[in-house]
Amino acid sequence: YNKYHVKEIDIFDPLFTINKKRVIEICKEIQKRNINIAWSCRSRVDTIDEEMLVEMKKAGCYRIYFGIESGDEIILKKIKKFTKISQIKKAIHLTKKHKILAFGYFMFGNPGETKSTIENTINLSLSLPLDYAQYNRVSTLPGTVLYENLKNTLGEDYWKKYVKDKKFERALPRFDCNLSDEILNKYIKKAYMKFYFRPIQVFRIIKSINSIKEFVRYVKAGISMIIN
């Protein structure tokens, strides 16, 4: 901080807020040392509470990225997220109460996913006071239960083969999900359009703009979203 004059850091640890005592100690130490720094972090919705948010705000936290994943209780159980819709709503509302930006990550194509469960996810994202939302197709990565299930289905370790030789690259089938990439992409576009082109969201974005350069960037992003 003193040597390189760092003004902002982003904590990528997805489990940063899992140990409340540790988080509060870090926040108090930042305040004790008078470190004037802005920072953001990742969090689950069920590991954050008001006491923690108060200290995080005092210590310079200005944005939290939440892995919400789905807005359907059945899907959340299937992917073993072990969170509830009520916890999602509480975490986001508490974060906004303390004037911290809330960013939500959502995934389409989970095991058991249907058009109906995707609609539930989109509707939840629209009902939350999120500043930003990101929607993606599920990626099956090594080390996850989903990948182990897929590996058993395929009868091979795709990632091991791919790492050794890129010629083995191919689209992986989805485990327990019959929705095609084309359908998922349509829902992703629908979600982005519905989320970012609402009057309230446009107002939030305009309110957050601090420069002409930033304004131009948002305009380009909006045009790109419409075209693509």
Report residues per predicted region:
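Active-site groove signature of glycoside hydrolases
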Residues: 1-12
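A structural motif corresponding to the C-terminal lobe/cap of the Radical SAM core domain
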Residues: 15-20, 25-210
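Hydrophobic alpha-helical membrane-insertion signals
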Residues: 201, 213-220
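Short linear elements at protein peripheries
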Residues: 218-228
